[in-house]
Amino acid sequence: MVPPVQVSPLIKFGRYSALILGMAYGAKRYSYLKPRAEEERRIAAEEKKRLDELKRIERELAEAEDVSIFK
């Protein structure tokens, strides 16, 4: 096995600083995007309900025309 390489404390500090800053940025970005995604999912669900209701009504009207007494 290869022995570990000595790394400058300045480089270590830079790496860990970048890691921590990246984690902080990711957490902030996630907290910003999460409510938007929830709102989009809610709107999509409402739209799906509306479209399903329209399809149901359309299907009932088509069935009513087929069962008409004026055949």
Curated annotation (Swiss-Prot):
Cellular compartment(s): Mitochondrion; Mitochondrion inner membrane
One CC-aspect GO term: mitochondrial inner membrane
UniProt keywords, alphabetically: Acetylation, ATP synthesis, CF(0), Hydrogen ion transport, Ion transport, Membrane, Mitochondrion, Mitochondrion inner membrane, Phosphoprotein, Transport
Ion transport in keyword set: yes
Principal location: mitochondrion
Alphabetical GO biological process terms: proton motive force-driven mitochondrial ATP synthesis
N6-acetyllysine PTM positions: 34
Any one GO molecular-function label of the UniProt entry: proton-transporting ATP synthase activity, rotational mechanism
Domain of life: Eukaryota
InterPro entries xrefs: ATP_synth_F0_esu_mt
KW Membrane (keyword) present: yes
List of residues that carry Phosphoserine: 68
Function: Subunit e, of the mitochondrial membrane ATP synthase complex (F(1)F(0) ATP synthase or Complex V) that produces ATP from ADP in the presence of a proton gradient across the membrane which is generated by electron transport complexes of the respiratory chain. ATP synthase complex consist of a soluble F(1) head domain - the catalytic core - and a membrane F(1) domain - the membrane proton channel. These two domains are linked by a central stalk rotating inside the F(1) region and a stationary peripheral stalk.
Subunit-level organization: Component of the ATP synthase complex composed at least of ATP5F1A/subunit alpha, ATP5F1B/subunit beta, ATP5MC1/subunit c (homooctomer), MT-ATP6/subunit a, MT-ATP8/subunit 8, ATP5ME/subunit e, ATP5MF/subunit f, ATP5MG/subunit g, ATP5MK/subunit k, ATP5MJ/subunit j, ATP5F1C/subunit gamma, ATP5F1D/subunit delta, ATP5F1E/subunit epsilon, ATP5PF/subunit F6, ATP5PB/subunit b, ATP5PD/subunit d, ATP5PO/subunit OSCP.
Recorded family membership: Belongs to the ATPase e subunit family.
Protein name: ATP synthase F(0) complex subunit e, mitochondrial
Gene this protein is translated from: Atp5me
